Each structure stands twice: as C-alpha cells, then as structure tokens.
Design a protein with these regions (language model features):
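Short strand-turn-strand beta-turns centered on an Asx-Gly dipeptide
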Residues: 67-70
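Ferredoxin-type iron-sulfur electron-transfer modules in oxidoreductases and energy-metabolism complexes
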Residues: 33-48, 89-248, 326-333, 369-373, ...
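Eukaryote-biased recognition of intrinsically disordered, low-complexity regulatory segments
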Residues: 2-25
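Short, structural beta-strand-to-alpha-helix junction motif
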Residues: 30-38, 79, 257
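Active-site nucleophile and cofactor-binding loops and adjacent substrate-binding regions
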Residues: 53-59, 348
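A short, basic-hydrophobic beta/loop patch
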Residues: 82-86
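Iron-sulfur-cluster electron-transfer modules
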Residues: 146, 178-312, 316-365, 369-372
Length: 384
C-alpha cells in the first residue's frame, strides 16, 4: 500500500483574496520523494493554479526555497515524510506575489547596493595569478546560492531589516573583503549595514543548503577587519572587553564568586571519571547556585571534579566583536591551565562558553602550535 502524506500549502492571491489560507492535499509518497515532487503532484493532479518557483531540481539554484514545517529549505532537497504532515509556506520578509512565489526585490535591491562583484583599480595583467592561499579564505563563502533562506530565518532581520542588511549581504561583503583583487571599502559597507547587529545565533547556518558558517566565516571575519580599521567594537561593547582585559571577567563582581566557595578538587570515593569544570563568568559571578548544582550532581554520580581557581573568561565577547588579540590571549591562558590538570574532559554549564571552547579555542591552538585541544569539551547535560 502506498503511503500518503497530508500537505498543507499556503495559498494567497492578492488580486482575489483578502487574506491567506492553507489548502490541504493528500499526496502519495514514494521512496526518495521531495517536497518539490509533492508540489508538482499537487499542481498536476489537484490544482493547476498553484504558483511556486523551481528550476534546477539539484539544489544548486536556490529558486525553490520555501518554508517547510517552519524552516526555510530547498523544496528539491527536502524529503517527504511517509504517513506524515507537511506544511509549506512562502519565505518570510518578502511580499507574496501569489501562493509560494515571493517578490525578491527587497533583498535584491539591498544586494545591488553592495555592488557584489570585484571592483578593480586597473585592468589586471593576463593571465591573472591567484594562489591557493588567496582563494581558501573565501572558498566557503562562494558557495552561497542566494536562496534567501537565511534572510527568511534571521531573527534580527525579522525585527530590524532596516538596520541589519542580513546574512546574504554579509556573506557577499566578506567574500569581497577577503579577495585581494577588490579595492572597494567592503568593511565600511558592512559596518554601515549593521555588521554588529548580528547576534551570531547561527540560525542562518541551520537553514543554509550549503551549511555556510556565516557568523564564523563572514560576520566575525568582517568584525576583525572593523577593529583593525578603527570602526569597531561598538562603544557599548567596550565595558565588557575592558573588564576582561583588566579583571579576567566580563562582568562585575556583585557577590562572593563561586570559585571562592568551592574546593579546587572535589573528591569522591572510587571515582568513575575525573573531569575539570570551566565555570565561565556568569557561573562564577552571577549563577553560583547553578554552578554548585553542577558540581554536586557530578559528585553524586561518582565523578571527581577539578575546579581550577585561576581560570578566567573564555573570551567569547572578544571573539564575537573582532578583538582577536584579547580573545586569543584568553584562550591560550585557559588552555594552559586546563591542560596542566591532566584531564581529557572539560565540563561547561554555559552554552556560549561551550561553543567558544569547542570552536575558537580549537582554532586558536591549531594556529598557535599546530595542534588542537588536548581535552574534549562537554556540555554538562551532554556529559551526563
């Protein structure tokens, strides 16, 4: 028996409808069937007035991108569930022309303003020489399909597109800023277009069909250049950065820190494991009870916990704002402290610290010594 899925499709024709609606269709699902296949089936067998875009059917053009079950995705690469329900809607932030077809001009006009092509000062000699080292930094950014899924998903764009031009534009600007052939002031363009408005939440990465790390490979790279040219960081960010530089913590002390109330070594009889605990600034200065609960839970599970008193801020605020000198100093300092403990696992209770240790610390140490971390980083719940 052929499985069937219920497909709810957004319908709206501004020439005829006062508001949108969802029409539901039963679609037989075969192995390997995609959302685009389902739309084609609906068009051919149920309603030929359904409007939607598609072209290559190979995940290379981005034209079929729609919102599938609440997340932007390429219809041609999204698998249909068997015996399930699928909701298909148009991309957010763009005016609907009809049904799933949106007017992309609000995004395209912003893209045009950035002049997303190489600006040269003179005609290059031919053949033009490009070394692998010149290409590598922008290689991932060149994969962008301009599908606009990241614009649809970005929470900052949803609230203030007038202030932040969005992930697509930042990807283009970063690619050109990293291209030695381009002479345009791309960093200044990015700064004017809200470079520091991005929260680096990585929602854009989750929906990107090419999995481009836009916050890491574009936004934060542009912020590094912004700092070097004197555009960044923003005035409001300096208090946290100065605090890290002066005290080793990103926030002020308001009560007795966690590190002053717990032993450096929490011993247990017959330990099943031995780990180190990275508190981070907030666990040490604001969420002391949470930190104590983590240590006590590990202890009750027969895990010996080392809590070095000389640990300091992971440097996340510095990494995120482009202050690489301060950020890498914090990374190297903390890595030295935790590697000296001889443990192979470091536990974190803060998601921001965990991300910084896993990604930024790893990258920093590889650049500094040609080798990554000698311990593995676990979120507390992940470790349990």
């Amino acid at each position: 028996m052929i499985a069937k899925s219920r497909v709810k499709v957004y319908r709206y024709d501004p020439d005829r409808d006062s508001t949108y609606r969802f029409d539901t269709f039963d679609v037989p699902v075969t192995e390997g069937m995609t959302v685009l296949d389902a739309l084609n089936y609906i068009y051919e067998n149920h309603d030929s007035s359904l409007a939607y875009r598609w072209n290559c059917r190979a995940g290379q053009c981005g034209s079929c991108t729609v919102v599938v079950n609440g997340k932007p995705a390429a219809a041609c690469r999204s698998q249909m569930p068997r015996d399930g329900e699928v909701s298909i809607a148009p991309l957010l932030q763009f005016p609907v022309i009809k049904d799933l077809v949106v007017d992309l001009r609000p995004g395209i006009s912003r893209l045009e303003r950035t002049r997303p092509y190489i600006q040269r000062g003179k005609t290059p000699e031919r053949p033009e020489k490009l070394l692998q080292g010149d290409i590598e930094p922008m290689k991932e950014l060149r994969k962008c399909l301009e599908c606009w899924g990241c614009i649809s998903a970005c929470p900052v764009v949803a609230e203030a597109w007038y202030e932040f031009s969005g992930p697509t534009m930042m990807t283009k600007l970063a690619r050109l800023a990293l291209d030695r052939r381009d002479i345009e002031e791309r960093v200044k363009m990015a700064f004017t277009d809200g470079l520091y408005s991005c929260t680096t939440c990585k929602t854009c990465v989750e929906v990107c069909p090419k999995s481009i790390d836009i916050p890491g490979k574009a936004i934060e790279k542009l912020r590094v250049y912004a700092v070097k040219t004197g555009l960044g960081p923003l005035e409001g960010q300096m208090a946290f950065l100065n605090s890290i530089a002066n005290t080793g913590k990103s926030v002020d002390r308001t009560s007795t820190p966690l590190l002053e109330t717990v032993p450096e070594r929490v011993e247990v009889p017959n330990p099943v494991d031995r780990v180190a605990f990275f508190t981070g600034c907030l666990m040490d200065y604001r969420l002391q009870n949470t930190g104590r609960s983590i240590i006590n839970t590990l202890r009750r599970n027969a895990v010996e916990v080392l809590v070095p008193k000389n640990q300091s801020c992971c440097g996340s605020p510095a990494f995120r704002t482009g202050m690489t000198d301060l950020a890498e100093k914090q990374a190297e300092r903390n890595v030295k402290i935790f590697e000296s403990l001889g443990v192979d696992k470091v536990i974190v209770g803060c998601a921001g610290c965990g991300l910084t240790l896993r990604t930024n610390f790893e990258e920093t140490m590889r650049r500094a010594r040609g080798e990554g971390l000698r311990f593995k980083v676990y979120d507390f719940t992940e470790y349990l």
